[in-house]
């Protein structure tokens, strides 16, 4: 779908996809594309007021494009543009004598607006003079147009009360207990001058006693509007009381009985009034003479400024409003206009530049719901004869799109302001045409009907038979239903407004309406103003406001009517009577200002602050009342704003509304958009009463919820009012995010508390926004759930959790968080204390981290070993922390339930320390994990330890693997008898801890027996035996460890300097000897690895830049507990790596030398190929059968390096 938006002579084609975007979005896209065509002028400025059809109808910015525009349609942009630093003409030809917007210029202009009538001339056209509409000339300082020149002084003006509200006693019209509609009609009819009414009627006084009058009466319908004006005397019986006394004549109309107007009363109500009056001794009837009937029908519409007060608004005491609890419906009222004839000017100059109109077929018909039916059932047939004059028949027709059954029915679209239809007054918008001059038009196309009508010559009469739908939209009556009103009598004020229509062209009144409907019963409760459209008559008048309830139009009450009937009444008045006079009279109900006491109770705005705000608002209204009602404008430099302006009329009692300001100030005042984002709307094509359900009317106008594009906004009337009271206290105040409410080391508890407080603030039921929970409220939670964090990283992650949860709440908090809530203040204070505690703990954690880093830097370990240890430690940590899940889950539940207590903080602190200590212990165990190795000695098969056959054997190797010494080349220490060294700090692990570790791998724990002196006992011999068994097992599996080709140096079985033992996992091992852990860690538990992995590895790939192990010492020694010197051992010479490390003197040994493993072969021997390795048998004893020993000594042995 594509739409062309015309900026003067420039057409901008805007692709709209499937047309599901709003008119407002189309306007923005068109503006952006138009500005791109003016890139050569960086100072060029454009402001779009609204979009129009080519025949003049204004598009509502809230409408969905596909519902109001067809594919490839043309729309006209009404806009202001400004060339940089020069005078230009806008497309309509009006001089745009101002430069691009400037804040200082606007401020100065606003101050001068009240004194200088800059450019406020009134355009007078011949059609305005012909129409007879009096020309009202005023100074720009006058607040409103003066009274009608021909208007007779009203009772209010005669009594000198022209500027005061006219308060009518509501008890004077309650002689009967009929519906309030009659009372309202009486109030409206009393507005007309008595002298004018007495000229057209005669008073007849009769006695209530005696014989019946003997008259036959029927409803008196107006020929102009179809309204019921009274009782029409159709006949008089012979020899009746009326005939004898000459009281009445046929064709006379009774319009008033005992000061009770019969205007808009149903026939039954009028009869009842008559019967009640006849029970009194004297009855006064006002009878309308036949010759004055037409004049009376026009006078019902109402003269200009019937009260003569300057603001043209009467304030009467709360007439009965429509009933109400919401469930609203909306109808967009814009009239499509007449294609011909000049339009008369009005007293107010149009602020929008006039743009050229292009001829266009009607694409947006404005019809009644009859178009949606097309059936003649329940329709009343009316025959109407129209005499074609020089101005034509004066109406337009429209039809549906063609269907499979042929052309659709043809309807009357609009009644033009000139022509035979408006003079006759019976034809209405929405009537279905059945016959023309006796010929049935059913099944004929619109073109054929138009040709038939145009074939009528001037002076001839066209006979039409039309069908008018009646009664099908009335709601069913519920007996005993209590009357509930949307605006109560005490809390609303009634205003009568006369709004000129002529200068708005075909834009009409320019309002979008919404219908209120009871949710419980479905009863219609009245129509309200949804929004004021820029460029329309209501916008230029500036007195109508959003959420005003319409109770009467042109003197015709809307009370008691269904929403559909009220819409039709308003449309009819717009299309016929309003165009005759160029003026429309509206009676509205408006919610008055809220008392200051009620506002001050809300706590956020004190009385002095409110009075200052009220004073500022009244000043701004005095200068420009339309600032509250602009619909929306666009400027490339300005972003659209949503301004919360109070529409309650706080200062309205003292300051009458003023006319709109000069166009030069318009840009600054209209850059604020009234957001109507409290409705979720359903749109339908054209105007066959496009009802849309919106939110309740009971909310005040300054509630400005964010517009939601989702459909999850379901209004909750119970919450709206309370929320409105809380929000209304500071209409212009911005609520900032209260980030302090979400800072806590226990995020779950605070987030839950805040969510509980806030969920009652939302005025609608919607799926709760995703509450961003932290990755964990504390370390215990993370320890139980998330195993990927280390200690110090957990603190950082907590900080990130705080940030993420804060950002998740910001949008909701801006809308609904109340200010000054004492409960939330307490939460915030507690949160700050918790934050301080947490920061201290973070500092401690960072200190521990630095100590660890220092130790790690001192140790020359390769990156591969660190990665393995970290991953292995995480696995162990997972198993270890598994035991504490139950306690931590309970802890988490306690945190969620409320605010953190002091005991909980202590628990959290202890938990953190405990986890840190265990984590460090596990890291140390990884570093000093007990290594298994094998020596090359054969042994019997039956000596194999049954650990290897145990299916539950976990093969966990590195519980006690030590970190490398800071210096491998330290001078040897003398052998010192003593207990075996455990970790590097010398602390032996607790038996309970070791038993827990053994339980993880399903192995029994056999603690070593220690003598009182700490020396190893007989268990050492057992460990040596098991070590020998493992060595034999390795030999049987084909491993020759560090063998030379010719010799094999083997340790003495009784050499006590070699001490073997059984580790926690059940494997035999050599306890820690200084500097030997690298070789030990490289020894396999059994099983061969894939040789290909080792053939393809680089020689130094497994060392990762760490130093190669170098063991020049002749014999191994125990790990010393002190720094005692070690006795030299000269039994062996150093044969390892002779080309790199020449053998040092015997007395300069720097480290232990393994007796059980012979030196590695020289470097020059070749590395065998894969085929040779594959041929090596598992039990071959020849050195050539084990090619893996022929390798670069700098490369770790591939068969022993696997962990």
From Swiss-Prot:
Bias type Basic and acidic residues, positions: 718-732, 827-842, 855-865, 881-893, 906-927, 984-994
Region (Disordered): 79-104, 138-162, 334-374, 718-743, 787-927, 968-994, 1050-1203
Cellular localization per UniProt: Endomembrane system; Cell junction; Cell junction, Tight junction
The PDZ domain, residue ranges: 201-289, 383-468, 496-585
Phosphoserine, modified sites: 100, 346, 352, 368, 635, 710, 728, 730, 746, 749, 801, 1088, 1182
GO process terms (BP): cell division
Comp. bias (Basic residues): 843-854
Annotated family: Belongs to the PAR3 family.
PANTHER family named in the record: PARTITIONING DEFECTIVE 3 HOMOLOG B, PARTITIONING DEFECTIVE 3 RELATED
Name of the protein described by the UniProt record: Partitioning defective 3 homolog B
Organism this protein belongs to: Mus musculus
Lineage: Eukaryota, Metazoa, Chordata, Craniata, Vertebrata
